[in-house]
Amino acid sequence: VADLYVFSFKKDNDEFITAQKYTELSGSTISFSTLSGEQRIFAIGNVDYDMFPGLSERLESWLGNNHPSKSDLTSLLAEVGGDKAVQFANTTSLVSGLWNNEDDTKDYCTVKVDGTLVEKGKIYLKRVAAKVTFKIEVADGREFKLKSYQVCEVPKKVNVWEGSTSEEIVSYSTQELTISKDEGFFTFYMPENIANGKEGCNSADDREKLSKGSLRNSPPEGRVFTYVDKPATYV
């Protein structure tokens, strides 16, 4: 984790308590100054990351006098910069997390007057953007040369917090991306937005079934999947 923003809110009325930023992190422990009492603690890390320009400015404004509400934070969207995010090769990824106790039954902590916690717990950080690798394997005696690929319906925005709801997510599709040498695999990066399918399907082939258009001859905007709502990312 290269940088970390931490926000604290009172449990009973969601009132803002404090926020701090950390830029020189080592190990897995930070020292956080807050008030005593029951509170929820949120953290966002690796904000200075090329995929989501503008997010750091938003969080920096919240460190000053422009304090966020809890709903401001939980509804926060990170917007992808440009249409080449899938090709970013940065090894760091935007992460977010909420303090939970050790057995994951409580999402708030109680800070005693002496600064120690009543409950044991941690802030569990989860990535907001995924690194996806496709590896092509063929049966014995068969041959397949990987020359190019296209990533369709890549989200332009992503919910920073897992499980939060947001406005309808706009998406884009890349141009055809060529592969200079045949290594049998390719890797791309994309924001994670999870949604359920329209209904269950009974076979692997059904996942690609189209009710409109074709994968080979139609542009992305001309395709409608039978079992999957837009925008579901596919390759």
Predicted regions mapped to residue ranges:
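Internal metal/ion-chelating core segments
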Residues: 119-121, 134
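Short, solvent-exposed beta-strand/turn "edge" segments of beta-rich domains on protein surfaces
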Residues: 121-127
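Tryptophan-paired
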Residues: 1-64, 131-235
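Structured interaction patches on ligand/partner-binding surfaces of diverse proteins
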Residues: 20-25, 50-119
